Every structure is written in C-alpha cells, then in structure tokens.
Amino acid sequence: MDDKITVKKIRVLFVCIHNSARSQIAEAYVRQLGGDRFEAESAGFEPGKLNPLVVEVMKEAEIDISDHKTKSVFEFFKQGRLYDYVITVCDESSGQQCPIFPGIVKRIHWSFPDPSSFDGTYEEKLAQTRNVRDQIRKAVENLIKEAV
C-alpha cells in the first residue's frame, strides 16, 4: 500500500491587460517562492510583448522570464481551467472585463503601476520597475503565507 499523501496544488491565475509585465512578475514569483504547493499562470485581455524592462529586472532577481509568452485570459476561460485564486494586478483588469472562472475560491485585486507608463531616463524607468517588482514579490509572499 502506498502511504504517500497527495496534496492538492493551489492554482493561481494573475491577470492584467497585456500580460507583459505585472502578471508575468507575479507568476514568476509564485513559481519561485511557492514551491510544489502552487501552480501559477498569467494571462491578459490583449496579450502583447514582454516588457524588456521587466525581463531585465527579473534577471537581476535571478529569474529568467525571457522565454515567457503572453497568453489570453479568454483562452484559459474557454478551456475551462479551474483556479483557487484569480488575482488582477492592474486597475484596468479588475472590473467587468475579467471573466468569472468556475470554482474560484478567491478573486483578489492588487493595484500596481504599469512599467510601460513610466517616464524618465532608462535608468529612472528601470528603478521604477524594480520598485514594482519588489512590491509584487511582497504581495506574493503574503499570498503564499495566507494560502498555505
């Protein structure tokens, strides 16, 4: 008889408009910090290209997302994917646009500035993007503590 206990993974979906920055950061941190207790994905309403500033600041944090692809939240919905948490990470995606996924335990909104909207020199934009990255990491750490 096999005495192994199978623990259900906590499934998390992060949603933003383009799936190019904030949702990608959050997904990467859940994958890194959540261990095998979590399964994370991210998607957007209008998938675009990964923001190069985000790729760079995540590389500084020793997380390589350069090969990540942006995905459509509507494709996930049509496929009938189930999530314990659906977390919107930009104000534009928190409203009516976000589909209601069946079986959601919690729907949460985290408001973070969009790195593509930052003004200033490249270094100033990089510093602002690092700040967003660090804020998202803290939010993910809190989520992991709460969910486990």
Regions found by a protein language model. Give the residues of each.
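Conserved active-site segments centered on acidic
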Residues: 1-77
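Cytosolic catalytic domains that perform sulfur/thiol-centered chemistry
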Residues: 5-11, 78-89, 129
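Conserved small-residue
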Residues: 19, 58, 86-87, 136
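Residues at the C-termini of beta-strands that transition into short coil/loop
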Residues: 44, 90, 111-113
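Short, solvent-exposed coil/turn elements at secondary-structure transition points
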Residues: 46, 79, 113-115
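Mid-chain, well-packed structural core segment of small domains
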Residues: 81-103
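Phosphate-binding/catalytic loops
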Residues: 95-148
